[in-house]
Amino acid sequence: VGAPLAETPENADVLLLPGGGDVHPRFYGRAIGGAVDIDEARDERELALVDEFLREGKSVVGICRGLQLINVLFGGTLHRHILGHAQVCGRDRLHVVHTAPGLLHALYGARFTVNSAHHQAVEALGEGLQVLACAPDGTVEAIAHKSLPVFAVQWHPERLCGAFARSDAVDGAKLLSALLRQSKKSKEFLKKC
């Protein structure tokens, strides 16, 4: 995130937007109420990076906050505070998601369990985005752009693999491997998610 904008797309195949604090509500036309741990400078840098990568035709992948930021970039809005999805006593919650046909369905099936550690979520979906997975309460859990190489999940696959793997949730390594392997091979891959 701290690399010069002009150099970043040239030196990378994929931009990964990780989790973190809340997206500042000013970026989607709202007042601060309910948002916490805001870093406006980070928001501005990451929004600019996404724009740079997309202009170069490169892939953008978001995790948690990354999904929220992508939604905002395309004109969507966020619920500033939802209940039932944040960590409890420092531990991720678990819940089921339901998927539409596509990458997630191919990897994990129509219904599977993921972790949850967020309190912001998609409210209005950004232009050109489509929902790929939802929680039972309707919370958007995965999105992709209809024509650009953009894909994002609300959960943390990096906290569901390796030493952090859980027997009661999906293997996050399957998703991360598929995204990174395929996005390096083809700019068209993420358009098909």
PLM features: what roles do these ranges have?
Residues 67-69:
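Hydrophobic, aromatic-enriched interface-forming segments
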Residues 1-63, 72-73, 79, 83-108, ...:
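N-terminal beta1-alpha1 cap of cysteine-dependent amidohydrolase-like domains
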